[in-house]
Amino acid sequence: MPEVIIGQGVDAESMLPETIDMLYSNGVIQQAVITSWNLENLNVNEPGTYTVRGTAEGLDEGFQCQITVKEIANVQDVNVTTITGVEPSLPRFVTIEYADETVGAAVAEWDEIPEDLYAQAGAFDVTGSIGPDLNVTAHVTVKEVQSVEEISVDTLLGQMPSLPSSVEVTFTEDTTEEMGVSWQISQEDVESAGVTNIVGRLMGSLET
């Protein structure tokens, strides 16, 4: 199993893999689900290298895993854009910078966001934690939509069209941005010839 790197003070279980690659005598590699970890020898508050054990489905004797705990020098802020009335989607993982100038990731637990903060155009910050003493900040920009790019596509009778995953959105301050879109289309929409209007829903927020 590859070495696992965890930031000092970060919850270990959130960063451990869920599967392990098992190499059989015939050369076949197959993934097995990890069922448990024994972390008694691990101290996430003290930088260093630790050896822990785990168990996996189909592996009678268990396995060993090397975990390196590194000192964290900085947690990178996150920039997110959303549209009015849509709760911003904050990332599960954030980037951390270690003292040895390498980078890694950690799971962030974000504070709840009151609806009034994204009810109108503006900006606000959200605080998240990646450990008892480590915080991360998300800078959220809320924009009001002025217009959305109209899409026109052709398809064959009975064949679902290839629709774009994003569209250009123009905001009230005259800026534009590509935003993800979810199309509300079914097979019934392409069962007869002619022009059909398909509704798309903006996905709401982007991490930049």
Region locations from a protein language model:
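Serine/threonine-rich, repeat-prone extracellular segments and beta-strand-based repeat modules
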Residues: N26-Q66, E101-T141, E173-T208
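Solvent-exposed, low-complexity, repeat-rich "mucin-like" stalks and linkers
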Residues: M1-I29, E71-V103, E144-T176
